[in-house]
Amino acid sequence: VLKTFDEMDGNTTSKLLGQYHKALALAAVGDFENADKILSGNVNGSLRLTRGSLIAHAQIMAELSKEEEALELIDKMALKGQDNELDLLRQNIQNGKSSYDYITSAQQGIAEVLFTLAFALNGSENDQTSLLYARLAQSLRPNNAETILLTSELLRDQKQFDLAIENYETISKDNSLYLSAEIGRAETLIAADKPDLAIAVLKELAVNYKKSSRVFMSLGDAYRGQKKFMLARSAYDKAQSLIGKPNSSHWFLFYTLGICNERLGNWPRAEMNFRMALDLSPNQPLILNYLGYLLVEKNKKLEEARKMIEKAVAARPNSGFIIDSLGWSLFTLGKFEDAIQPMERAVELMPDDPIVNDHLGDVYWKVGRKREAKFQWRRAISFDPEEKELVRIRKKLEVGLDEVQAQEKKK
């Protein structure tokens, strides 16, 4: 059997899968030392495939009296308070109560093979195959919460919302992954256009998991999706109070806080949030683009804004909204001819976006292509812009961009 695992060397992925399951097979018969060598990367390269491989390796190290190394591994890969099962494993190792029980039978091993394949294919073009493997894994190991979560996520991604919700609900309250299941159920309700039900689920979790920053982050995301920015900011503020000292994984929290504060009209605090997010993750294109775009919109620090957006474009050259920001920054700097190419590219990537079409219309107007400008503005109106933007676009069609800008300067 072990030789079969070694023969799985067709490519890097199959080799990693083969060695991972060889390690699990060794651990199942009590050969923890050789299992540890494989999972530690001492043989055939480092292995860290799934959350399950982290749990298995930590349990194996604890069996070898490597408790400190096991705790270091968990702390490196998972934040406290973000994963109840890993928090419990951490506690058991600290108290000397951990024992290896991740995979102990052939049936569990086959289920883990299927789960690993489903996990590896998730997000690829083989979603149906991924779901098939996940369903088979769940049939062999019906009470395995991690498999249930993956299957539910795949069902949600394929818009089988009722089946996904039903599957999430099979994880009981006493399971360490119940919180993850409930958050997944809430996210599925949002995807199914039932935000009020999702928010009700998350509000109940906020009562029962008062110290979970993850719950308040999810609640903030749900409110933000409904443009309830005051409630979203309150939830994010609560999450911030629970995280302790921020690290690189917390950039999204400060990014979303910045969005809420900007929408609520508190620009100084919003800029502070965005710059904190950027300190935590300096090369994150979402932050670079959003902050850069807002600086351009406010006509502040334009050169810094342009450099931020150019850096974001370099990271995501096929992102329509980021390329739109680049074109708009050039437009704001008065470089109208230079703005044409990125704005046209942005419209190619996001043809149905009202803001991008409106921006291209403005660029065309400034270079004298007024008939094309009006065409783009009419397209923008057809894509249902927000009321404030709609009024401004109609005004531009009536009197032209130059007159609208002149009137705005007088205010």
Regions found by a protein language model. Give the residues of each.
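Solenoid-like repeat scaffolds
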Residues: 6-14, 40-49, 75-82, 103-107, ...
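Generic helix N-cap/helix-start motif at coil->alpha-helix transitions
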Residues: 11-21, 46-55, 67-69, 80-85, ...
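Residue-level recognition of tetratricopeptide repeat
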Residues: 24, 59, 119, 153, ...
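Position-specific recognition of the canonical hydrophobic site in helix A of tetratricopeptide repeat
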Residues: 27, 62, 122, 156, ...
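Residue-level detector of the short coil/turn that links helix A to helix B
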Residues: 30, 65, 125, 159, ...
